Amino acid sequence: MSEYTISQVYPTDKTVLAQIDTLLGQEGIRRDGNLDYICAMFDEEYNVIGTGSCFGNTLRCFAVSSAYQGEGLLNQIITHLIEVQCARGNMHLFLYTKVKSSKFFGDLGFYEIARVEDTLVFMENRRDGFGAYLRDLEKTRTEGKSAALVMNANPFTLGHQYLVEKAAAACDTLHLFVVSEDASLVPFAVRRKLVEAGVAHLPNVVLHDSGPYIISNATFPSYFLKDEAAVIDGHARLDLAVFTKIAAALNITARYVGEEPTSQVTGLYNQIMCEQLPKAGIECVVVPRKEANGKAISASTVRQCLQSGDWDTLETLLPKTSLDYFRSPEAEPVLARIRNAGNVVHY
């Protein structure tokens, strides 16, 4: 087997990045918008013949030149990326791949979590990772009607609280999943704390971390899906494939979502969810958004108000628990991050 050089490619290296983009294009994929490490494999004349990337705890954007396939180069690239991740302290790794490539990654020690037929497979490098997560969830399984809510809560608003109250009133147990990945302006630890405080008056709400299995639009890999509509569709269907397994573990028969009058992405996501969930015996319940000042309450408006210091408006958008936090010295690092963020609407 030939030994070729593998090295990191930096954002400033436009020449090599252009070669990587060409190579990815030949494989029918493109460079993902979310990457924090890119490597390239070079031949003796410093031409790019292979590439792979990381983002957070995921591996992404693999390709090997067709002239070099069959030499085991992709194995070397994956091994290199796993070493990079280990050096970062990321031992539990994930990847998304085309269905036809899943067996290859299975041979490298990755195990299927869920799949969207003919589109993609979500995999991890732990044989029992998702299984252990489901068994952990099962400890909170209850009799009676169980429902679910999944929210980012970036941050927790009166709108979120209203949605939780509506859902909790309609079931015996409400399983509330907070998206745990830190792709939001408000860090996960703070988001979870504000959700916990904001639902403390509801005794039938069970709070869960989504773990690495439910991810947001912000970090879903788009590199092998042809356009934005396909990305939204792929993400929604994968999320639902994962959620259906979670629902089975917890005896969940309904999922609640907030109506989405402004975000096209979330609106399409909700539409797919309402089409697909009933096929798995799960009711999809869309709850009209709570309004303030004649407009639907949204976390993006809250972030804008936090950025500009508009506390009068914030008093109409946040529950007391969230408001008290943002007025406390503890919130200063988060507020500084929001003030320095530029555009906070789509964050």
Label for each model-derived stretch:
Residues 85-98:
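Conserved GNAT acetyl-CoA-binding A-motif
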Residues 35, 55, 116-117:
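Structural motif
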Residues 1-31, 42, 47:
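Short amphipathic alpha-helix that is part of the acyltransferase structural core
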Residues 97-98, 102-110, 114-347:
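Nucleotidyltransferase catalytic core that binds NTPs
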Residues 40, 46-63:
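Conserved beta-strand in the GNAT
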Residues 36, 59, 144:
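Short coil/loop residues immediately preceding or within conserved phosphate-binding loops
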Residues 68, 72-80, 159:
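Conserved acetyl-CoA pyrophosphate-binding loop and the N-cap/start of the following alpha-helix
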